[in-house]
Amino acid sequence: MSIKQHRPKVGEILECDYGQFSHTCHVDGHIPPEMVKKRLVVVLNAKLNGLILVAPISSKINLDGIKNGYHIEIDSELIKATGFYDKRTRWIKSELIQSVSRLRLYHIYDKGTKITQYLPRDVVTKVQRAIIKAINASSLLDK
């Protein structure tokens, strides 16, 4: 069940159902390389009139994303393993931030038990700085 009534906090890790690609590549569905499927996300802002700003978390390394400073590594110890999500290094993809409806967001469960997880503040700060780079506003960052 989606998080309709839950007020997520910055740094909270949830699951987002981005949906699937449209079979016809029509603009009414997702088009590659847009984000699809259910995946972990980190909450960046939950005060957007019913929308939640999130950044997706991926287990696939992208060297260009790392080199450009858009992908922030998350140590395998920061995300609890569940029956679905194994323990591995992951990356937050800051160039793929998106505002999504609460109806797309779900709590993470393991064997029927809800898991509440938050990234440390220093990791969230790295993500926020990477987003500034991704929107081509690096001049706003302290050198």
Swiss-Prot record:
Q: Which family does it belong to?
A: To E.coli YifN.
* Gene Ontology molecular function: any one: DNA binding
What organism is the protein native to?
Haemophilus influenzae (strain ATCC 51907 / DSM 11121 / KW20 / Rd)
Q: What is this protein called?
A: Uncharacterized protein HI_0080
Return any one Pfam family short name. Answer: PemK_toxin
Query: Any S-S bridges, and between which cysteines?
Result: none
